Amino acid sequence: MDIKEKLPLEDQTIDSLLRPISWDDYVGQEKVKTNLKIILEAAKLRQEACDHLLFYGQAGLGKTTLAHLVAKQLGANIKITSGPALEKMSDLAAVLTNLEKGDVLFIDEAHRLNKSIEEVLYPAMEARKLHLMVGKGPAARMLSLDLPPFTLVAATTRANLLSGPLRSRFGASFKLDYYENPDIEEIVKRSAKLLKLKISPEAIRMVAAASRFTPRVANRILKRVRDYAEVSAAKQIDEAVATKTLEMLEVDKLGLEPHDRRLLETIIKKFKGGPVGAATLAAALNDDRGNIEDIYEPYLMSIGLLARTPAGRMATEAAYEHLGIPFPDKKLI
């Protein structure tokens, strides 16, 4: 089972329950929180709209939650949209013209904004102006509308795909990193308390260890552990319950799922450990190159199982060891 699959409605509702609603609830990312709170407090003291903010990092690290906390600290309403939802200029115009003074506009998946939409955003972000072309042909004219002071908060998993002009218009950019294990354990403990679960310290550690250092994944595993505990009539979530659940999910002790192991095995067995290019690897896996680069690789690289070199991807000695495959002495990585 892929624990990153699209969530059913019930899980989405539970996710809303587990989402931190205050800075104290938001565990981890301490440097980001410290700098962000200073920016927000200064804007409030000046009674000005906050600078536009960009959050980037892997999925599930808390970018959306930060956007909500920004709006809460500013005492502002938050309007939510996404890059794919803003296909036409009229889509963006409808969003911008419905903003009120001080609103926070959150655009998720900002890297999927098309260039024409970005160009409309430039004057909106810089000068609070919305420039619209009215009419067609020789009768066409430019209409300029004033916008109220607002704060744009954008989130992306691929900051490199944002154009330079768009990136430069954010007053502050924050990279969210993978979480430290103690922070993930604290998040699991908090979520278990909110879900009214009786869970042992050993089970908390197991869920955290399999979470890929990502709060969203940790919470999703915890919900599946809860399901198994209820169905098996377990009195509490202990090490045995957590172990059985992870086995059923095919998630190992490092948080690797079947597709992660298959990627490493393919590099080792088909390409002698690498190096192998992304396009060739995608073809061998019958998978999308974007999935490899955006979903699988970052975590595998962060835990030292995969190396990305100018010549291509290589499985490290640690990958051989984790998969129980002898590491060839002649191949040094």
Regions found by a protein language model. Name each.
Residues 41-83, 93-101, 122, 157:
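Walker A/P-loop
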Residues 10-56, 93, 97, 202:
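Pre-Walker A (pre-P-loop) alpha-helix and adjacent loop at the N terminus of AAA/AAA+ ATPase modules
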Residues 70, 89, 103-133, 159-169:
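Conserved AAA+/SF3 P-loop NTPase catalytic/coupling segment centered on the Walker-B
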Residues 161-209, 219-220:
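Conserved AAA+ ATPase core "coupling" helix
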Residues 200-201, 211-226, 236-238, 256-258, ...:
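The conserved phosphate-sensing helix
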Residues 267-333:
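Terminal-proximal interaction/regulatory segments of ATP-powered molecular machines
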Residues 222, 227-250, 260, 314-318:
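Conserved C-terminal helix/linker of AAA+ ATPases
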Residues 204-209, 216-231, 262-265, 279-280, ...:
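C-terminal helical "lid" of AAA+/P-loop NTPase domains
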